[in-house]
From Swiss-Prot:
One of its GO terms (molecular function) is structural constituent of ribosome. This is Large ribosomal subunit protein bL25. Belongs to the bacterial ribosomal protein bL25 family. CTC subfamily. This is one of the proteins that binds to the 5S RNA in the ribosome where it forms part of the central protuberance. Keywords: Ribonucleoprotein, Ribosomal protein, RNA-binding, rRNA-binding. Part of the 50S ribosomal subunit; part of the 5S rRNA/L5/L18/L25 subcomplex. Contacts the 5S rRNA. Binds to the 5S rRNA independently of L5 and L18. GO terms for cellular component: cytosolic large ribosomal subunit. It comes from Rickettsia typhi (strain ATCC VR-144 / Wilmington). HAMAP family: Ribosomal_bL25, Ribosomal_bL25_CTC. PANTHER family: RIBOSOMAL PROTEIN L25/GLN-TRNA SYNTHETASE, ANTI-CODON-BINDING DOMAIN-CONTAINING PROTEIN, RIBOSOMAL PROTEIN L25_GLN-TRNA SYNTHETASE, ANTI-CODON-BINDING DOMAIN-CONTAINING PROTEIN. CDD domains: Ribosomal_L25_TL5_CTC. One of its GO terms (biological process) is translation. InterPro entries: Rbsml_bL25/Gln-tRNA_synth_N, Ribosomal_bL25/Gln-tRNA_synth, Ribosomal_bL25_b-dom, Ribosomal_bL25_C, Ribosomal_bL25_long, Ribosomal_bL25_short, Ribosomal_L25_dom, Ribosomal_uL5_bac-type.
Amino acid sequence: MSEILELEAKSRTEFGTGAARALRREGRVPAIIYGAGKIPISISLEEKEITKYYRRPAFISQLINLTIDKKQYKVLPKAVELHPVTDIVRHVDFVFLEAKTQKMEVPVVYEGKERALGVKRGGYFNIIKRRVILLCDINNIPRNVTIDVTNMPIGTSLKSSEVKLPIGCSFVTKKEFVLATIIGRKGVKTEIEGEQQVAGAMQ
């Protein structure tokens, strides 16, 4: 599960392009927190710190304790604007967390896909879902969903009903869907059929 980051922020009362440029000259980044029916709060963050955290894996699904003027808020990153050349963070949108659960889009990691049974037989591992939307307990937001696919044979599909999700998480959609398949390359079917014919002749 994700660790909870601790961030310090300052309130800001000046807005617009000029104010944002002035902040960046001071080594700070403009940001805003909104959602949950609350009045938005405009803040600034230390540029080096927020850029460092942004470059960590799965920053968008990262639960953050944000302290502003000695008051603490639980927030999630919603959107990040980057400098087009340097990839330094230029602006961040956060959302307030008030409910006990939160919809999250998290990456899927297919562990062992290069050595899956079906791949060893000449199949191709076809990823259909690289990210999935989950409903998560805000205290147990995963960095990703890791699925072991080493035993997946050729000509099969991995369905959502077969996936064991992290504790406190469920798929938002109740309808079953396919995350990945292993499809046969040209010649694989012929090879399998040949093996089946040999096996039949030996019986």
